[in-house]
């Protein structure tokens, strides 16, 4: 800390200002304000961050000393002002808590009570954020014995004012000789760290990470130092290196990583104007600029900054694992430790952990750097890797070069890992954590720490990839197979399950390289297969899966699965049932590994329907596609049979059906046709809109709640309907809009509640929805189609230009309008209003919300029920949608192509 820094705090000038004023508060506030401005300016100028946070602690020391001197403490008084916690370490960020201990010799505080209260009141009045406790030495011992946090804070202490002897006595009575021996302290801190990591989903890669508490954050470094201090006395990172826990290169890496996080934390506090350790979207872009990160645009700069952030915290997590493992071996070593058990000539088992038998194993036999992970997968009883061996792996990974990558021993070992019955994910994750995976597969190294700046992808690309492999492995577990029955069944019967793991490893490997990542990844996957000498059939399947890993989810979410042509085209693209099985399992794992909130009952039912219909088409033969007329006849025959058995007059049925048109029978099952028909025929002529709600278990709509609406057609009907559903907190996932020849609308919506589940059989909720829709649709002209709602905080930070693509469907007489736009409350109602303005009819819609963006597909016709044919009209329509959805967006809106 500096001894003198007049720019930051001029003691003489401050003393003079105190003397001039009746109250000291103004002088203190002025000094604090000026110091903050000086330090912030130094930060913006790029001053050394370690010096900055030490300078702030030095400044606060001076302020506290001056405040302490305002009160009458006798020179030999048994009272001291002690800095504890982070402030005790001499580290203070702009709005960090200033933790103080007012330490007394005796538990009798009465003699000092008035002065202590007035001192603390002064600190609050001048604007210092202090956390204070008033304790005697004995009370410190009592509190510390019962509370891990208290003893930890007291270990990091400095005397600011008063006699140092009190703090020394306090340190003595709270030492390992009296409480918290190093073994107990280590076990408690390790458990505390595990609980903290679990709070942050056990990943360094949260979208809005906590710089202090997340895995790989500043708290992990502090945990290392706390354990070391309890075991060895006063230590810092350099002293840890001296004790053999760190080599010099690791010490330098840990120190530079700590300084990077300090910069981020300092910037967070400065920008937020308060204590803030969450790296929120609100601040990521600004901090990227402050720290000098650049890119082709602001989004790229943020992604570059966050990639650096994630690589830094991953380095900290790696070294934290290494040091904690080292502590465990030293602190928890049993007195009667059993001798190591040989595994082979290169490795042995030491207290349940694998270790190299000598320091030259990896240098002399580099293939052992892959063999160690295969051994752990083959022998799951191995707990992990000894600390010295982790260090040897890190020190020798530079030996992984092109010769290593092409050595048949190494390629064979890597493939062997994928054939192990268990441990694939765990050991790939270890390989990534120790820096081996990215060296062996340089293309994988490129995606390490690569974040996509959106709400859809909540993990970095490497974390998502390993997560996908984890999901594939979990399909073997009973509790998981119950949630994903079809995927688990198919996974169990895949002829070569190792191939889906390899495809999973490569499916997103092409991201971040400015092109179609599926195509780029397929090229990399093919090179991988050739280098590892995989058979032709295996190679072709892996490459095909990587190239087409998005096709199934895209088809399920964006195409009309009731259209036989859609199923036929998808079946043609897949080709055979084996590929279909692999693709379905990969797709399920991919969605769940991308973002847990993406998987819901509706998305599951869409994929299952597409799988089942495609399998049926493949078994029937691609040369024999389903005939539309035959499908209509089958649906009508089955529905009529249900109705007649229920006592409905066939003549009434035929009369109604004659008004509905072919599309209605193509889009609905026989059961739904019978359900709708029966309700419509019983509806009084002046009974108002008919609203039916069903928790359906039919294959086509399984997992969603079906809402069927029958009412006289009006121009603004769709806009009002979706606005009313928005007010009812319903998420629309599918819309099927049909107008009968008698000008009645027959609309079917598949909805989920906001939690992603179907409505269920809750009669109160069903009645609320039915009544709300009926009331809104009784007088559509009186219902506001656009209802203002607050945009969620996170969505505000992902503005991008809406994109609209318009083209005519090759198989059906409709125009397809594809919309990609930022998700906003009331978006569908706004689109419906534009369709109304342009005199367009909506025939069908597929609605998908992916994080902060919507990817919706609308099937529309003109006023004459024909596809759009006027390019000028399409251009105006496109401009209107972009303009309407760009309110409060960035001005550089790009229009997408139009093809008619």
Curated annotation (Swiss-Prot):
Cofactors demanded by this protein: Mg(2+)
Entry EC number(s): 2.7.7.59, 3.1.4.-
Gene Ontology process terms (BP): regulation of nitrogen utilization
CDD domains assigned to the protein according to its UniProt record, in alphabetical order: ACT_ACR-UUR-like_2 (cd04899), ACT_UUR-like_1 (cd04900), HDc (cd00077), NT_GlnE_GlnD_like (cd05401)
Region annotated Uridylyl-removing, chain positions: 343-705
Molecular function via GO: [protein-PII] uridylyltransferase activity; phosphoric diester hydrolase activity
Activity regulation summary: Uridylyltransferase (UTase) activity is inhibited by glutamine, while glutamine activates uridylyl-removing (UR) activity.
Positions of region (Uridylyltransferase): 1-342
Sequence intervals crossing the membrane: none
SMART domains from the UniProt entry: HDc (SM00471)
Entry keyword Transmembrane: no
Residue ranges occupied by any ACT domain in the UniProt entry: 706-789, 816-900
All residue ranges annotated as the HD domain in the record: 461-583
A Pfam family recorded for this sequence: HD
Keywords: Hydrolase, Magnesium, Multifunctional enzyme, Nucleotidyltransferase, Repeat, Transferase
Catalytic activity: [protein-PII]-L-tyrosine + UTP = [protein-PII]-uridylyl-L-tyrosine + diphosphate; [protein-PII]-uridylyl-L-tyrosine + H2O = [protein-PII]-L-tyrosine + UMP + H(+)
Function text: Modifies, by uridylylation and deuridylylation, the PII regulatory proteins (GlnB and homologs), in response to the nitrogen status of the cell that GlnD senses through the glutamine level. Under low glutamine levels, catalyzes the conversion of the PII proteins and UTP to PII-UMP and PPi, while under higher glutamine levels, GlnD hydrolyzes PII-UMP to PII and UMP (deuridylylation). Thus, controls uridylylation state and activity of the PII proteins, and plays an important role in the regulation of nitrogen assimilation and metabolism.
Family to which this protein belongs: Belongs to the GlnD family.
PANTHER family referenced in this protein's UniProt entry, alphabetically: BIFUNCTIONAL URIDYLYLTRANSFERASE/URIDYLYL-REMOVING ENZYME (PTHR47320), BIFUNCTIONAL URIDYLYLTRANSFERASE_URIDYLYL-REMOVING ENZYME (PTHR47320:SF1)
Swiss-Prot/TrEMBL domain comment: Has four distinct domains: an N-terminal nucleotidyltransferase (NT) domain responsible for UTase activity, a central HD domain that encodes UR activity, and two C-terminal ACT domains that seem to have a role in glutamine sensing.
NCBIfam families: PRK00275.1, UTase_glnD
The name this protein goes by in its record: Bifunctional uridylyltransferase/uridylyl-removing enzyme
Annotated source species: Pseudomonas fluorescens (strain Pf0-1)
Name of the encoding gene: glnD
């Amino acid at each position: 800390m500096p001894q003198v820094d007049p720019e930051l705090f001029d003691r003489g000038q401050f003393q003079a200002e105190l003397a001039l004023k009746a109250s000291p508060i103004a002088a203190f506030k002025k000094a604090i304000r000026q110091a903050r401005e000086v330090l912030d300016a130094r930060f913006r100028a790029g001053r050394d961050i370690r010096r900055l946070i030490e300078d702030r602690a030095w400044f606060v020391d001076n302020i506290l000393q001056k405040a302490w001197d305002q009160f009458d403490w006798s020179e030999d008084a048994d009272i001291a002002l002690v800095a504890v916690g982070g402030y005790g370490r001499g580290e203070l960020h702009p709005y960090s808590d200033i933790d103080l201990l007012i330490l007394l010799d005796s538990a009798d505080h009465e003699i000092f009570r008035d002065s202590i209260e007035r001192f603390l009141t002064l600190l609050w009045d001048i604007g210092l954020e202090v956390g204070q406790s008033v304790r005697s030495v004995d009370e410190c011992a009592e509190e510390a014995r019962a509370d891990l946090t208290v003893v930890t804070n007291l270990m990091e202490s400095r005397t600011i004012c008063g006699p140092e002897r009190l703090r020394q006595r306090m340190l003595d009575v709270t030492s390992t000789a009296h409480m918290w021996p190093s073994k107990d302290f280590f076990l408690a801190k390790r458990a505390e760290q595990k609980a903290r990591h679990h709070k942050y989903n056990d990943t360094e890669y949260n979208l809005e990470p906590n710089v202090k508490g997340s895995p790989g954050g500043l708290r992990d470094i502090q945990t290392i130092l706390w354990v070391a201090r309890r075991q060895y006395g006063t230590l810092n990172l350099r002293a840890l290196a001296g004790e053999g826990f760190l080599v010099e290169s690791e010490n330098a890496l840990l120190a530079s990583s700590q300084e990077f996080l300090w910069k981020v934390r300092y910037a967070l506090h400065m920008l937020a104007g308060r204590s803030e350790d969450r790296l929120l979207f609100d601040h990521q872009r600004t901090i990227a600029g402050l720290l000098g990160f650049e890119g082709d645009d602001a989004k790229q700069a943020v992604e570059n900054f966050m990639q650096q952030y994630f690589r830094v915290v991953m380095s900290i997590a790696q070294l934290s694992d290494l040091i904690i493992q080292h502590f465990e071996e030293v602190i928890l070593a049993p007195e009667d430790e059993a001798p190591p058990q040989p595994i082979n000539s290169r490795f042995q088992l030491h207290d349940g952990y694998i270790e190299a038998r000598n320091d030259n194993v990896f240098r002399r036999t580099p293939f052992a750097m892959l063999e160690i992970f295969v051994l752990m997968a083959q022998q799951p009883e191995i707990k992990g890797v000894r600390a010295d061996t982790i260090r040897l792996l890190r020190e020798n990974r530079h030996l992984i070069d092109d010769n290593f990558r092409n050595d048949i021993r190494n390629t064979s070992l890597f493939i062997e890992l994928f054939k192990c019955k268990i441990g694939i994910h765990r050991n790939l994750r270890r390989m990534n954590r120790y820096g081996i995976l990215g060296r062996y597969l340089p293309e994988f190294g490129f995606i390490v720490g690569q974040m996509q700046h959106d709400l859809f992808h909540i993990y970095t690309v490497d974390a998502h990839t390993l997560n996908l492999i984890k999901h594939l492995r979990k399909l073997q577990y009973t509790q998981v197979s119950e949630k994903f029955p079809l995927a688990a069944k198919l996974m169990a019967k895949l002829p070569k399950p190792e191939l889906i793991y390899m495809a999973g490893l490569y499916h997103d490997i092409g991201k971040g390289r400015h092109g179609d990542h599926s195509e780029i990844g397929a090229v990399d996957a093919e090179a991988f297969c050739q280098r590892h000498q995989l058979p032709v059939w295996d190679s072709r399947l892996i490459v095909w899966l990587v190239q087409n890993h998005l096709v199934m989810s895209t088809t399920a979410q964006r195409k009309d699965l009731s259209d036989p042509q859609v199923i036929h085209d998808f079946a043609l693209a897949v080709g055979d049932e084996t590929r279909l099985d692999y693709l379905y399992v990969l797709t399920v794992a991919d969605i769940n590994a991308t973002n847990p909130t993406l998987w819901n009952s509706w998305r599951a039912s869409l994929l299952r329907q597409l799988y089942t219909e495609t399998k049926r088409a493949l078994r029937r033969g691609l040369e024999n596609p389903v005939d539309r007329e035959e499908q209509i006849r089958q649906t009508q025959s089955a529905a009529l049979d249900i109705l007649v058995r229920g006592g409905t007059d066939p003549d009434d049925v035929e009369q109604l059906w004659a008004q509905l048109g072919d599309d209605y029978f193509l889009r609905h099952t026989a059961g739904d046709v019978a359900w709708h028909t029966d309700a419509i025929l019983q509806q009084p002529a002046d009974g108002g809109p008919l609203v039916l709600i069903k928790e359906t278990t039919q294959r086509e709509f399984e997992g969603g709640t079906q809402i069927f609406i029958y009412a006289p057609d009006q121009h603004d009907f769709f806009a009002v309907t979706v606005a009313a559903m928005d007010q009812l907190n319903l998420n629309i996932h599918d819309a099927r809009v049909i107008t009968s020849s008698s000008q009645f609308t027959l609309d079917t919506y598949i909805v989920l509640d906001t939690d992603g589940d179907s409505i269920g059989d809750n009669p109160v909720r069903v009645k609320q929805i039915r009544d709300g829709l009926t009331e809104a649709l009784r007088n559509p002209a009186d219902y506001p189609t656009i209802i203002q709602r607050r945009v969620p905080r996170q969505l505000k930070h992902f503005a991008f230009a809406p994109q609209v693509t318009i083209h005519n469907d090759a198989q059906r007489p409709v125009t397809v309008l594809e919309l990609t736009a930022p998700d906003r409350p009331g978006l569908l109602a706004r689109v419906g209003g534009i369709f109304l303005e342009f005199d367009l009819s909506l025939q069908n819609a597929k609605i998908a919300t992916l994080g902060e963006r919507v990817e919706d597909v609308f099937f529309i016709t003109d006023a004459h029920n024909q596809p759009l044919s006027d390019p000028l009209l399409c251009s105006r329509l496109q401009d209107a949608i972009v303009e309407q959805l760009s309110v409060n967006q960035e001005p550089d809106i790009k229009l997408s192509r139009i093809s008619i």
